[in-house]
Amino acid sequence: MRRNAVIRSAIMPSLLGAALVAAVPQAFASNLIFCSEGSPAGFDPAQYTTGTDFDAAAETVFNRLTQFERGGTKVLPGLAESWDVSDDGKTYTFHLRKGVKFHSTDYFKPTREFNADDVLFTFERMLDKDHPFRKAYPTEFPYFTDMGLDKNIARIEKLDEHTVKFTLNEVDAAFIQNLAMPFPSIQSAEYAAQLLKQGKASDINQKPIGTGPFVFSRYQKDAQIRFKGNKDYWKPDEVKVDNLIFAINTDASVRAQKLKAGECQITLNPRPADLDALKKDPNLNLPSQAGFNLGYIAYNVTHKPFDKLEVRQALDMAVNKQAIIDAVYQGAGQLASNGMPPTQWSYDETIKDAPYDPAKARELLKKAGVAEGTEITLWAMPVQRPYNPNAKLMAEMLQNDWAKIGIKAKIVTYEWGEYIKRAKGGEHDAMLIGWSGDNGDPDNWLGTLYGCDAVDGNNFSKWCDAGYDKLVKDAKRTTDQGKRTELYKQAQHILKEQVPITPIAHSTVYQPMRKTVHDFRISPFGLNSFYEVSVGK
């Protein structure tokens, strides 16, 4: 039996020292206003996959069994104080923290503290399709299934009020890291029982209850989310503001102006065109770091003509990536050629792009029997993301590139939550999307985004290659990093050869904030956490 209290992920060291804006905090202000980029689809982290949703719930309202250190990738104890791992790597026994209180609100008054029943409810709801709560409120859990946890967790047992044992079918080298991600945020079993009794199970997604540093107060879509500092938080020194407010605006330029005017203290995803003005403002800080991210085009291989490799190859080599980098990222992006960033361990540096060659692309389309003037849809995100600061402009440039080879792309967009929902349903032909790493493990890219288990979730290409999938799953089932690297490199070559995606760029992440903000740290995972953050004069 191996005893663990803290483990370290094997991500490149360059990400471990994430950017920090800090000084000795001054007198704390009552309000911290965050100019956020979009409305969350809901407040139940298990249902979602985007940073917008996670910022609004997982990073505010909830905790998990394990957690990542602020601004880094090291895994620390969370609601579990410690854990034991069996010698065969298939059994994890978690020793739960005592004295942790769930939020008390006008819609729920807890009668007990956090215990093993809450862990069981959180995971059994995702595991069991016949779970009473899931039957009352049917929903999907994309991360849980995309990562194969629905198949790999054999059982969860309550050993006592503060001890829980997970038994896996296979070794999962990233299991502890996975539990620190947003999706397995611990829910209150008592609150769930109340909702079932009231016939309001869906309220778990609209009126969240957690153990986190901030208590949900109210939400007005496309306007604001309000939270109160949790005065009963189990780490009271980490709550340094009375009120946390998300001021929602999808326009990056408007967010920048609000920041400059002092209408908010922190924002995110600035337009590259606004960076110079933000840098020159004496009232602002503009910390940055290399993004652990990827912006890419996903081709839906279940739609014709994308089911043909030659078509995907043609579209890929017709993309003028350098022009996109220059116009869209404006010096804040690096060309991408692989399905994950170069700072991820196991990245294969031998993988190169096919040369930009519109003439050859035309030949490939002709060979595939694709007629001149064939129409397709190209979906563009309505919001700025860390990996794509201007999806509209990128889509217009791709539209122009593909027109040169006889493909007419119609640009389509939806509100962010609807965009993701429809894309998971496979309505798109090609789409702009991207990813910020979640846990420092290669499986979070190669399995979560391109694996067969993820075709109904984050695998927006709907691509499922048996050979590729076996390599990725075999890599996850061993803790030998050398063997894992070898398997992942083989998988990366298959991914490149089959072209379910066109990687575009890895961006530099900027986090503008006023100089009155103290101790905010940029997350390598593209999330925004506000515990331990204060606002001075």
Swiss-Prot record:
Residues 1-29 form the signal peptide. One of its GO terms (molecular function) is peptide transmembrane transporter activity. InterPro entries: Peptide/Ni-bd (IPR030678), SBP_5 (IPR039424), SBP_5_CS (IPR023765), SBP_5_dom (IPR000914). GO terms for biological process: dipeptide transport; protein transport. GO terms for cellular component: ATP-binding cassette (ABC) transporter complex; outer membrane-bounded periplasmic space. It holds the Pfam family SBP_bac_5. Keywords: Peptide transport, Protein transport, Signal, Transport. PANTHER family: D,D-DIPEPTIDE-BINDING PERIPLASMIC PROTEIN DDPA-RELATED, PERIPLASMIC BINDING COMPONENT OF ABC TRANSPORTER. Belongs to the bacterial solute-binding protein 5 family. Part of the ABC transporter DppABCDF involved in the uptake of various di/tripeptides. Prefers dipeptides with acidic residues at the C-terminal end. Involved in the uptake of phaseolotoxin, a toxic tripeptide inhibiting the enzyme ornithine carbamoyltransferase. The complex is composed of two ATP-binding proteins (DppD and DppF), two transmembrane proteins (DppB and DppC) and a solute-binding protein (DppA1). Five orthologous SBPs (DppA1-A5) are present in P.aeruginosa, which increases the substrate specificity of the DppBCDF transporter. This is Di/tripeptide-binding protein 1. The lineage of its organism: Bacteria, Pseudomonadati, Pseudomonadota, Gammaproteobacteria, Pseudomonadales.
